[in-house]
Amino acid sequence: ACPNEYFYFDYAQDQNSVKKILAYDPCSDDRLSPEQKKYIWGVQANLWSEWIPTMKRIEYLIVPRMIALSEIAWVEPAVKPSLEEFYRQLVPQFKRMDVMRVNYRVPDLQGFYKVNAFIDETTIDLTCPLPGTEIRYTTDGSMPTKESTLYNGALDVTETTDFAFRTFRPDGSPSDVAHTKYVKAPYAEAVTAPAALQPGLKAVWHDFRGNLCADIDAAPVKGEYVVESVSIPEEVKGNIGLVMTGYLEVPADGIYTFALLSDDGSTLTLDGELLGDNDGAHSSVEIIVQKALK
């Protein structure tokens, strides 16, 4: 058995998958005594192949996660590389894997979120940890191909636009498609908070067995709580559908960034607008979104 969030390599990957592996310390579990920790011999990962059709797909799922696993097995926690340093060290190994035709997963593009907010205009400045790759993109909802527009430097955006970016290796092999939205909008107006407002969030627990957040409200209510953060109250067990509501204090006008991480579905609604859609049945996935607030 392995911690599934880190080491079930058949789980879908995102921008945090390798980072979480590198940050893992098998000796950091407070449930183990110093005497018990002496018996930790190493680390392992699992890959269940019932739904994996080809060896090429297996390669895609385990590389470079398998290399990150090896890194934490033989390197002391104090000297483990950062994600950026890890990919820098891998550059010559990626070239070797190109020659060997290994179907590795290209590192994620950097420089944008799932939803990006701007007021007048903004610039997309992409980077890829893997040198020698091409980045191509579309704005019409189609999947980028080798014939799509080439990203060749900073890209100015002046209107709300949906982008699909895709990286291509030197041999033409494509990466996953990265979808992002750039939203042009003025600062959202502040609202007047109730006079008797108390700190925290109101959390309503529903006895919910479904997969979509939109269906939670129709399920029976089992309890109401006040929580200090977005988290599951200790009393909540079994079938869980949580609806949390509250107010956000905005100290100054600006572009605010929100991260939404969940194992299965979650959504973030702000001022009645669905801002972050991380819904549906899935393993641990994080999305990051922005909104202009005053």
Regions found by a protein language model. Give the residues of each.
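Short, compositionally stereotyped local motifs that mark structural "simplifiers"
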Residues: 81, 87-204, 209-246, 255, ...
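Substrate-binding groove of N-acetylhexosamine-processing glycoside hydrolases
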Residues: 1-135
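Short beta-strand-plus-loop segments that form exposed binding edges in beta-rich domains
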Residues: 294
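Beta-strand elements of well-folded, non-transmembrane domains
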Residues: 49-51, 246-252, 262-266
